[in-house]
Regions:
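Bacterial signal peptide processing site
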Residues: 48-51
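Boundary/linker segments of alpha-helical solenoid repeat arrays
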Residues: 81-85, 116-127, 180-189, 221-253, ...
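C-terminal soluble interaction/assembly domains
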Residues: 408, 412-506
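C-terminal motif of bacterial Sec signal peptides marking the signal peptidase cleavage site
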Residues: 44-46
Length: 506
C-alpha cells in the first residue's frame, strides 16, 4: 500500500505528528498542535511591536545631536524590514536633513519618491494576510500628505544647498503630485496642501520665475482659505505681502490694488517698489514633533455576562494597550463571546513654542522679525486619518468577523476529528487557542512618519548687503524665551538669498 506520508513534501516531515496520523493518535496529535498553535500565537503577537528606537531618536535630536539620530535610524534598518522600506527611507532622509547632510538626505528621499511612484502605479499589497491577521502585514505606503512632504523636504534640501535649479524640479514634482491627487480624490478629502503650494511659490520666486511664483502664491492663498476648517491655518501674513510684492514687480496694478484693499493691515509691511539689490534671509523653523498613532482597542461583548467581564477587565487593567492585551486575550478567549476591533488614533505631541524671533544686526542697525506658522502637521495628519476612517472601520469589522468565524470553525473541525473517542476537550482547547490568537493579533496600523515636526514656521527678512550677527530665540506661549539663543555670523552679497533651518523639539 502506498505510504500516505509520501504525498507530503519533505519539508513537512519535521512535525512530530503529521496531519495523517491525527486520526490514529488524537491525544498526542492535539497535544502537539495545541502547543504549536499557542507558540504561533505568541510569536505573531510579538512580531508587530512598535519601533523602540524612536524614543532614543527624539532624545538625540532634543540634545542637539542629529548625527546620533541618523546612526540610530540606520542601525534599526533591519527592524523596519522589507514591508516598511518606505518608512525607513522617510525617517532616514528626514534625520539626515536635520543633521545638515542635505545631499545624503536627497539621495535617500529620491529612493522614497520612486518607491511612492511604484506604489501609486502597482499597489502591491498582500490583502489576504491583512484580512486574516491585521493591517500591519501590508507594506507601508504612507499617507498622501507624507508623499507630498517627501518632495517638500527635498526642495528645502536643494534650497539649503543653494541649488535653485534642482529646487525647481522639486517644486514641479509637488505641483504634479497635488494635481494627480486633485484628479483622483473626490469630495473634501485631502487633495491640496497650502504650505506645499506656498513653498513652490517661494522657490519659483527665488529662482527668478516670477510668473509661476505668482500663480503659486495665488493658488496657496485660495487653498489656505478653502482648507482652514481642517488645516487650522489662517492665511499667513507673509503670503499676503508676497502677493503684493510680486504683483508690483509684474506691474499687475489692478491685482496690487485688490490686495491692498483686501489686506489693508499689511500695506505698510511691503516697501514698494521692490529693491532687487536687497539680500534676503529665509528661516524655516521646525517646532515640536509630529503626532504619533496608537491603537484604539474596541471590545465588543455579545452577551450580558460578556459585558460584565469587559467592564471588570477595564476596571482592573484600564485602557487596553499592546502591553496588557495578552491577559485580556486569555480571559476573553476562554469566555468566547467577546470580539475585538483595533483602530488607529492620533496622539498629538503639542509643542510649547509659540514662535521664534529672528534678529540680524550689523553693529549699527538691527533687523528683526517673528516667525509665522505656515503648516500644522497635527491638523493635516488628522485630516488624512479622518478621510480613510470609514474604510478602516469596515475593514477592521470584516477582519474580526472572519477571524472569529474561523476560530469557531477550528473548534468544530477539532471536535469532529476526535468525535470517535469522545475527546470533547480537544475541540474546546482548539477553539480557545484560536480565539486567543484572534484577539492577540488584532492591532491597528500605527506606522507613520514620526521624525517630522509638529509645526513648520517660515520667516523672510530683507536686508542690505553686509555682515551680520544672527540670533534666533524660541519663545513659549507665555512669552518666555526657551533655552539658549541660536547664534551665527552671516555675510550677504547684494541680491543674495540664503535659507537657514532651525529645529526646536520642546
Amino acid at each position: 500500500m502506498r505510504n500516505p506520508h509520501s504525498a507530503f513534501p519533505q519539508r513537512f516531515k519535521f512535525f512530530p505528528i503529521s496531519p495523517f496520523s491525527c486520526r490514529l493518535h488524537e491525544a498526542n496529535c492535539w497535544s502537539w498542535w495545541r502547543l504549536g498553535l499557542l507558540g504561533f500565537v505568541f510569536l505573531l503577537a510579538g512580531c508587530n511591536g512598535t519601533f523602540s528606537h524612536y524614543k532614543e531618536v527624539d532624545h538625540s535630536l532634543k540634545a542637539g545631536n542629529p548625527d546620533k539620530a541618523v546612526t540610530l535610524i540606520q542601525e534599526a534598518e533591519d527592524d523596519y524590514g522589507r514591508k516598511n522600506r518606505l518608512l525607513y527611507l522617510m525617517d532616514e532622509g528626514m534625520v539626515l536633513h536635520l543633521a545638515g547632510r542635505y545631499e545624503e538626505s536627497n539621495t535617500v528621499l529620491e529612493e522614497a519618491y520612486l518607491l511612492v511612484e511604484e506604489l501609486y502605479t502597482t499597489r502591491l499589497r498582500d490583502q489576504a494576510s491583512a484580512i486574516l491577521i491585521n493591517e500591519t502585514q501590508l507594506p507601508f505606503e504612507g499617507e498622501p500628505f507624507e508623499h507630498v512632504l517627501i518632495n517638500v523636504i527635498m526642495g528645502l534640501n536643494y534650497a539649503l544647498l543653494q541649488n535653485w535649479n534642482e529646487a525647481l524640479v522639486e517644486a514641479r514634482r509637488i505641483d504634479h503630485r497635488l494635481n494627480v491627487l486633485s484628479d483622483r480624490v473626490e469630495g473634501d478629502a485631502y487633495k491640496e496642501d497650502p504650505f506645499a503650494r506656498y513653498l513652490t511659490g517661494v522657490l519659483y520666486e527665488i529662482a527668478g520665475d516670477l510668473n509661476n511664483a505668482y500663480v503659486a502664491y495665488r493658488k496657496a492663498e485660495t487653498i489656505y482659505d478653502e482648507t482652514q476648517s481642517w488645516s487650522k491655518m489662517p492665511l499667513p501674513d507673509g503670503l499676503k505681502t508676497d502677493l503684493m510684492r510680486v504683483a508690483d514687480i509684474l506691474h499687475l496694478s489692478e491685482d496690487l490694488e485688490e490686495y491692498r484693499t483686501k489686506y489693508p493691515e499689511m500695506v505698510d509691511e511691503v516697501p514698494l517698489p521692490y529693491d532687487a539689490d536687497m539680500a534676503q534671509l529665509i528661516v524655516v523653523s521646525y517646532h515640536g514633533r509630529s503626532p504619533k498613532k496608537e491603537d484604539l482597542f474596541i471590545d465588543v461583548p455579545i452577551s450580558l455576562d460578556a459585558l460584565a467581564l469587559v467592564a471588570l477587565a477595564k476596571s482592573v487593567g484600564g485602557q487596553s494597550t499592546r502591553s496588557n492585551r495578552e491577559g485580556e486575550a486569555l480571559i476573553y478567549g476562554i469566555h468566547g463571546q467577546i470580539a475585538r476591533v483595533a483602530l488607529p488614533r492620533l496622539v498629538p505631541q503639542h509643542t510649547k513654542i509659540a514662535y521664534s524671533t529672528i534678529q540680524l544686526t550689523d553693529g549699527t542697525t538691527t533687523f528683526d522679525a517673528r516667525s509665522q506658522r505656515v503648516y500644522d502637521i497635527d491638523a493635516v495628519a488628522e485630516k488624512n486619518l479622518d478621510d480613510e476612517y470609514a474604510t478602516l472601520v469596515l475593514r477592521a469589522v470584516a477582519r474580526t468577523a472572519m477571524k472569529m468565524a474561523a476560530a469557531e470553525g477550528i473548534g468544530i473541525g477539532a471536535r469532529s476529528a476526535v468525535s470517535k473517542n469522545s475527546q470533547d476537550w480537544v475541540g474546546l482547547v482548539a477553539v480557545i487557542l484560536a480565539r486567543i490568537f484572534v484577539l492577540m493579533t488584532e492591532e491597528a496600523d500605527i506606522r507613520s512618519w514620526r521624525t517630522l515636526p509638529g509645526e513648520i514656521h517660515l520667516t523672510r527678512l530683507w536686508i542690505p548687503a553686509g555682515s551680520y550677527n544672527l540670533m534666533v530665540n524660541a519663545v513659549d506661549r507665555q512669552g518666555r524665551v526657551i533655552g539658549q539663543p541660536n547664534t551665527d555670523q552671516l555675510d550677504f552679497r547684494s541680491g543674495e538669498v540664503r535659507l537657514l533651518l532651525r529645529q526646536y523639539l520642546e
